[in-house]
C-alpha cells in the first residue's frame, strides 16, 4: 500500500493518530523503532537542524525537499511535512506540492503567512488575504498527482487578526477542499 493511502486511512480512522515531530533521519529511525504509525516534521526543526537558525524562510524549497526525502528513505511509515507558505505565490505552491510528492511525503501543510514567513511561535507574523490563500489551496489540490496526498491548510490569523478571522478562514479553506485544518 502507498504511504499516501495509508496516511489517509490513518487520518480518516476514528482513533487518535499520534505523530511525533522528528527533525532528522536519526530521530526518524527512533520514531519508527518506537512503533509510531506515521511521523511529521516542521520547518522550525528543519531550520534548527540544518542551519542552527530560527524558522524565518531561510531554507529553500530544494533544501527542504532534500531533507524530507532523506527522512522518507529511512522509514516505512507515512511522513507529513511542513510546506511553509508553499515557498512563494500560487505558482510556487504547485511546484512545492509536486516536489514533496516526488520526495515520498504522504502530505503537507501550507500556511497563510506572508512570504518570507516567521515561525508560528514568533511575534511579528502577518497573513495574506484569505482569497489569496484560497487560490494557493486550489493550486495545491490541482497540482497533486496522487489524490491520497493530504493537503492541510494552516492559519496564523488567530495571532494576527483574532479568533473570528481564523474561524472564517478555516471555513473558506474547508470549502475549497483542504483535507485537514490547523488553527
Question: How does the language model describe each region?
Answer:
Residues 2-183:
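Alpha/beta enzyme core
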Amino acid at each position: 500500500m502507498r504511504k499516501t493511502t495509508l496516511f489517509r486511512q490513518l487520518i480518516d480512522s476514528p482513533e487518535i493518530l499520534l505523530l511525533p515531530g522528528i527533525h532528522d533521519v536519526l530521530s526518524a529511525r527512533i520514531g519508527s523503532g518506537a512503533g509510531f504509525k506515521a511521523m511529521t516534521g516542521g520547518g522550525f526543526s528543519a531550520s534548527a537542524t540544518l542551519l542552527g537558525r530560527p524558522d524565518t524562510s531561510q531554507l529553500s524549497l530544494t533544501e527542504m525537499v532534500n531533507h524530507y526525502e532523506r527522512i522518507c528513505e529511512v522509514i516505512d511509515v507515512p511522513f507529513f511535512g511542513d510546506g511553509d507558505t508553499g515557498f512563494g505565490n500560487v505558482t510556487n505552491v504547485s511546484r512545492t506540492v509536486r516536489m514533496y510528492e516526488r520526495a515520498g511525503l504522504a502530505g503537507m501543510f501550507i500556511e497563510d503567512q506572508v512570504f518570507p514567513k516567521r515561525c508560528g511561535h514568533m511575534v511579528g507574523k502577518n497573513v495574506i488575504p484569505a482569497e489569496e490563500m484560497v487560490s494557493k489551496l486550489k493550486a495545491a489540490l490541482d497540482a497533486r498527482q496522487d489524490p491520497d496526498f493530504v493537503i492541510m491548510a494552516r492559519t496564523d490569523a488567530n495571532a494576527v487578526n483574532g479568533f473570528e478571522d481564523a474561524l472564517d478562514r478555516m471555513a473558506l479553506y474547508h470549502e475549497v477542499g483542504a483535507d485537514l485544518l490547523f488553527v
